[in-house]
């Protein structure tokens, strides 16, 4: 009996990993949201967020998890952002150190600005855990549009992220 339970758990775990690795979230269309949120991390996230902002997918963007040593002028130079766009539309968040912190920082920013919808822009392999952490912090009425940035993650990245997702999901149940 114990062997069957263990075998069943292992099968569910393995199938879950196959599902996780083979169905990574894709970019969303150009649907309008109140804001765009981009956690710092792997390449492509911030350029995707800026492109969406410029295309009118939202009026404001939060980049969460920015290193405290990064100055806005450096951010602007790195990502080709002009002063007008920076002043009107981009907020740099400096308080988050990890994905959970990104969710906390995002929830505070969303509440402070009374937004009802946001586009979450992050790496495809990072999307599910970020969304779980964010859903745990946001009011249920805030709509989150998932916009995955395509990457070529290694097996190790996928394997590690799958387990972080499981842990995040279990923590939300507690």
Describe every region a protein language model picked out.
Residues 21-159:
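A structural signal for short, hydrophobic/glycine-enriched beta-strand patches
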Residues 3-19:
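Hydrophobic membrane-insertion alpha-helices, especially the h-region
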Residues 155-174:
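A transmembrane-helix-recognition feature enriched in membrane-embedded lipid enzymes
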Residues 17-24, 168-172:
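Structural signal for membrane-spanning alpha-helices in multi-pass inner-membrane proteins
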């Amino acid at each position: 009996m114990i062997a069957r339970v263990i075998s069943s758990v292992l099968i569910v775990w393995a199938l879950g990993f196959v599902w996780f690795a083979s169905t990574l979230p894709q970019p969303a269309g150009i649907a309008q949201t109140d804001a765009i949120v981009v956690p710092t991390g792997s390449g492509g996230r911030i350029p995707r967020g800026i492109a969406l902002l410029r295309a009118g997918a939202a009026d404001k963007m939060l980049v969460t998890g920015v290193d405290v040593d990064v100055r806005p002028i450096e951010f602007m130079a790195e990502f080709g952002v002009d002063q007008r766009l920076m002043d009107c539309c981009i907020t740099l968040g400096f308080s988050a150190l990890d994905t959970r912190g990104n969710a906390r920082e995002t929830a505070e920013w969303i509440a402070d600005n009374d937004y009802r919808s946001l586009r979450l822009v992050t790496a495809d392999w990072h999307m599910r855990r970020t969304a779980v952490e964010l859903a745990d912090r946001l009011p249920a009425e805030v709509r989150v549009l998932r916009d995955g940035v395509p990457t070529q993650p290694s097996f190790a990245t996928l394997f590690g992220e799958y387990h972080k997702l499981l842990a995040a999901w279990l923590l939300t149940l507690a």
